[in-house]
Regions:
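Acidic, low-complexity intrinsically disordered regions
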Residues: 1-164
Length: 164
């Protein structure tokens, strides 16, 4: 069930039972697959100058896969690996009621970007706080590597120009 897609955060209303009513099943692979495809298509349709420099996909689940019809574990792992290797996407996996690290491993998600949590209001608050820290760290790490790359590029550019 997709409730919000590419909405500015200030336009997103808090989830309530009138907006989101859990069904008791978890089509985890379908949710991930559709999100990756939709995000990829949205990015490809943008002008190059408008494309995001960093894509972080957060997966939050309170149940194990038990209802997907379009995607399977192998296909999702391949999709995630492709986006990580070819486009440097970051995937964060937050899961309750399962071995989050074992599930993340089967999906090709880095264990450093994985958290397990208790399926309770307190557990959810705690993992979302951890998630905020993880996103800040990813952004900081990305900015540092971009700065390093630009500094290296400038150094090489200056070295090449000094040869002329």
């Amino acid at each position: 069930q997709q409730i919000y897609t590419a909405q500015p955060i200030h336009q997103v209303e808090p989830l309530t039972v009138s907006i989101f009513n859990p069904s008791g099943t978890t089509a985890l692979y379908d949710a991930i697959g559709l999100t990756v495809h939709d995000t990829e298509n949205r990015i490809e349709s943008m002008e190059a100058r408008d494309r995001p420099d960093l894509v972080i996909v957060a997966i939050l689940t309170d149940g194990q896969e038990n209802a997907s019809r379009e995607y399977n574990n192998k296909l999702i792992a391949e999709m995630i690996s492709h986006q990580q290797e070819m486009h440097n996407w970051r995937f964060i996996f937050l899961a309750a009621n399962q071995d989050a690290f074992a599930t993340a491993r089967t999906l090709s998600i880095d264990p450093r970007r994985t958290k397990s949590f208790e399926a309770s209001p307190e557990g959810t608050r705690a993992v979302l706080s951890d998630f905020t820290d993880m996103v800040a760290e990813e952004r900081s790490s990305w900015a540092s590597s971009l700065y390093f790359y630009l500094a290296l590029t400038k150094k090489h550019y200056m070295a090449i120009n000094s040869l002329n």
